[in-house]
Curated annotation (Swiss-Prot):
The keyword DNA repair does not apply. It comes from the Bacteria. The basal body constitutes a major portion of the flagellar organelle and consists of four rings (L,P,S, and M) mounted on a central rod. Belongs to the FlgH family. One of its GO terms (biological process) is bacterial-type flagellum-dependent cell motility. It is found in: Cell outer membrane; Bacterial flagellum basal body. This is Flagellar L-ring protein. GO terms for molecular function: cytoskeletal motor activity. Residues 1-18 form the signal peptide. Disulfide bonds: none annotated. The lineage of its organism: Bacteria, Pseudomonadati, Pseudomonadota, Gammaproteobacteria, Enterobacterales. Keywords: Bacterial flagellum, Cell outer membrane, Lipoprotein, Membrane, Palmitate, Signal. InterPro entries: Flag_Lring. It comes from Photorhabdus laumondii subsp. laumondii (strain DSM 15139 / CIP 105565 / TT01). HAMAP family: FlgH.
Length: 229
C-alpha cells in the first residue's frame, strides 16, 4: 500500500514538472534554407551554338545584375521594425433611486413591533461604477539577416526564408525570417528592407539559463490560474 502511495506521489510530481515547460509554436516553420536541384550536363551535339545552362548553374548574362531570381539565391534583409501602439479606455456609470411608503394605519400584529398607528418607510439606493484602462507598447528591432530563395511565385515574387544562430556563453540566440519579396524592391547591393517584405515572419528567441530565468515557475503558474483574486 505504501509503495502505491509513493508511486502516485512520484507520478504527480512528474506531471507537475512537465508543466514547467511551455511549448512555443515557432512563427517560421519548415526548412530555413533551400538549394537548387542538380542538373545534368548537356550532351554536345557538334553545333556551333550550344544550349547554355540555367542562371543558377553558373551562367550569368553579361549585362544583367546579380539580383536573386532563382531558388537557392541569397538576399540580405535589413531588419528595421518600429512598432508602437497605445490604447486608453474609461467608463462611468451612476444610478440613484429613492422610494417612500407611508400608511395611516398600522396592522394590529405590527403595532408591537414598530409602534404607533402610522407607518413610514423610506428606501434609498445609490450605485456608482467607474473604470479606466490603458495599454502602451513600443517595440524596436534592428539588424541584418541573409535569407535564401526557396520558392518562385507565379507573378515573379520571391518567397525567402532564413535563420541565424548566435551562441553566447551557455545560450543560443535564434533569428528566423520568412516572407515574400518583390524583386523590384531589391537594391543594387542585393538588400531589401523588412518594411517592404510581404507576409513577414520575424522571430527572435533564445535558449539557455538566461531564457529560463525569464519564465515563471510551474507552481507560480498553477496558483495564478486557480487563485480567485
Amino acid at each position: 500500500m505504501a509503495n502505491k502511495w509513493r508511486c502516485s506521489i512520484a507520478l504527480a510530481v512528474l506531471s507537475l514538472t512537465g508543466c514547467a515547460y511551455i511549448p512555443q509554436k515557432p512563427l517560421v516553420e519548415g526548412a530555413t534554407t533551400a538549394a537548387p536541384s542538380v542538373a545534368t550536363a548537356p550532351v554536345p551535339n557538334g553545333a556551333i551554338f550550344q544550349v547554355v545552362q540555367p542562371v543558377y548553374y553558373g551562367y550569368q548574362p553579361l549585362f544583367e545584375d546579380r539580383r536573386p531570381r532563382n531558388i537557392g539565391d541569397t538576399l540580405t534583409i535589413t531588419l528595421q521594425e518600429n512598432v508602437s501602439a497605445s490604447k486608453n479606455s474609461s467608463a462611468n456609470a451612476s444610478r440613484n433611486g429613492k422610494n417612500t411608503f407611508s400608511a395611516a394605519l398600522t396592522p394590529r400584529f405590527l403595532k408591537g413591533l414598530i409602534g404607533g398607528d402610522k407607518t413610514d418607510l423610506d428606501m434609498e439606493a445609490e450605485n456608482t461604477f467607474g473604470g479606466k484602462g490603458g495599454a502602451n507598447a513600443n517595440n524596436t528591432f534592428k539588424g541584418t539577416i541573409t535569407v535564401t530563395v526557396d520558392r518562385l511565385l507565379a507573378n515573379g515574387n520571391l518567397h525567402v526564408v532564413g535563420e541565424k544562430q548566435i551562441a553566447i556563453n551557455q545560450g543560443t540566440e535564434f533569428i528566423r525570417f520568412s516572407g515574400v519579396v518583390n524583386p523590384r524592391t531589391i537594391n543594387a547591393n542585393n538588400t531589401v528592407s523588412s518594411n517592404q517584405v510581404a507576409d513577414a515572419r520575424i522571430e527572435y528567441v533564445g535558449n539557455g539559463y538566461i531564457n529560463e530565468a525569464q519564465n515563471m515557475g510551474w507552481l507560480q503558474r498553477f496558483f495564478l490560474n486557480v487563485a480567485p483574486f
